[in-house]
Amino acid sequence: MHTRTLVLGVVLATSFSGATALASADAATSHHTTRADRAGAYKVTAKVNKTDPLLNSKVKIKGAVSPGAPGAAVTLQVRYQDQKKWKTIDTARLNNASKYKFKDKVGSVRERKYRVIKAASANRSAGRSPALKVTVFGWRTLTSLTPATTAGVAEVDNATINGVTYPSSLRSVGLPSGSSIEYNINRDCKAFRGTAGLEDSSPSGGTGVVSLLADGFTKYSGGFGLAQAAPVYFEVPNVFRLTVNTTTTGGGIAAVGTPEVLCSF
């Protein structure tokens, strides 16, 4: 009797130890599998159609997620140059090919970055795209900037050239030669536009020459009599200083109607 009891105890102990070992092994295996499954993150690609869009236009951001997750949500985030935190601005669903697309209207002239986030799933860590830098450009009047230097050219509320009144303009004042006004645009602008001509209040025999320079290089020069005007446009990539020179004869008043620069500030 004693021998049978002892044998049974050994069998039970052995069975219990084996079951415990198996349970521990299963738990370890389960834990290991979960960690392994979540060790990989989703890969999110992204590209933007324009890196230098115009104010109030729309940029398009599109890309894909792998491994595929059709129907899953992805979010679009933005961070502006003067901010530290990312802000979620839109959500989309992945199509059958695990691709997505977003559109965003850029309503302010400043640099921003976009990124796309795919949240974690049961067996995959969250993924995010690289940040996409976008610099928005908008037209602004040159007279909204503070002149670096000025001599004989004034900023005026309006100038009338060939019967057309232009707001926020420039015109010569008194000096027949050597008149100029200069602005620093700090290599943050892409183009200049305006209308050059002779102000309508000039005497009949007056004339004027308007010259526009970018970092000392002449980009435009034109001579005008009364009721003469010409549209002016040129690019100013990587230009630090923009100069407007005027020369007049016979009491003429040279003018630039509504000069504007396309800038990212």
Language model regions located:
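Gly-Asp-aromatic-enriched flexible segments
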Residues: 130-265
